[in-house]
Amino acid sequence: MMQITMENKSSVSEFILMGLTDQPELQLPLFVLFLMNYTATVMGNLTLMNLICLNSNLHTPMYFFLFNLSFIDFCYSMVFTPKMLMSFILEKNTISFGGCMAQLFFFLFFVNSESYVLTAMAYDRYVAICKPLTYKVIMSPKICCLLIFSSYLMGFASAMAHTGCMIRLSFCDSNIINHYMCDIFPLLPLSCSSTYVNELMSSVVVGSAIILCCLIILISYAMILFNIIHMSSGKGWSKALGTCGSHIITVSLFYGSGLLAYVKPSSAKTVGQGKFFSVFYTLLVPMLNPLIYSLRNKDVKLAVKKTWKRITS
């Protein structure tokens, strides 16, 4: 039924993805570079997920959220990276209308879910530092599962809303997407029908989600900072900062790179420039997250040593 609706609404049956650049001399170097990036992202996130599963000392709320963050980054990179790599080796990288809408849906689902998971992680750090005596009660397995389920549910709802609005548009003439993936803003200029609802949806839904998540994260860290200031021991300071450091870096990278891609001065707000900024949060952030949590975390380092001993013994 959906397939019939999409065909009736649009005369375009497929789109052509322009990719990151059309300069021939850059195609091979960029293919190798992003293939290495993709391999590192997949291996890094799979390794971290396996470490958390195999080591009982990592079966805590903090690592439960981290497992889901790695799972999202793993899936997230698989949504568009293979198709992006094809753009470097094919003369014409096409994607069907249905495939484009599916890619858009899963991209939005995972990126929104990651935003909410990062918010849940900030709340977890707040409870761990500010309410250590009741931490296990507040962050019970039931509450943790509820927070993760809510994160995925909110991501699903947002993706459904945006994709549903996009499917309703008519695409008549141009089918060339000036991007390496199907995203909201590269698709809107191709529509020959009104995009007012889509633009309103993007402003309201995305704006509300960002404000809500950022507000919860900022309040959580404000409370943590207030608590740290009143700590008497330097050891407490060090432990608190060590616990939050990795998450602060991850949040800064995720939201900072996202803002670069979508919130720019009007003079620079073009899709062509946006796709270069998109590389940071679509390709670099999923690759860096496992490294950030591995290099700065003693528990993960210990888990690596234990797992390595099991393999070699």
UniProtKB/Swiss-Prot annotation:
Subcellular location, principal: membrane
GO terms for MF: G protein-coupled receptor activity; olfactory receptor activity
Name listed for the protein in its UniProt record: Olfactory receptor 8C8
Residues bearing glycans: 8
PANTHER family: OLFACTORY RECEPTOR
GO BP term (any one): G protein-coupled receptor signaling pathway
Topological region Extracellular: 1-27, 81-96, 158-208, 261-274
Function: Potential odorant receptor.
Paired cysteines (S-S): 100-192
Domain of life: Eukaryota
Keywords per UniProt: Cell membrane, Disulfide bond, G-protein coupled receptor, Glycoprotein, Membrane, Olfaction, Receptor, Sensory transduction, Transducer, Transmembrane, Transmembrane helix
Topological category with respect to the lipid bilayer: Multi-pass membrane protein
A GO cellular component entry from the record: membrane
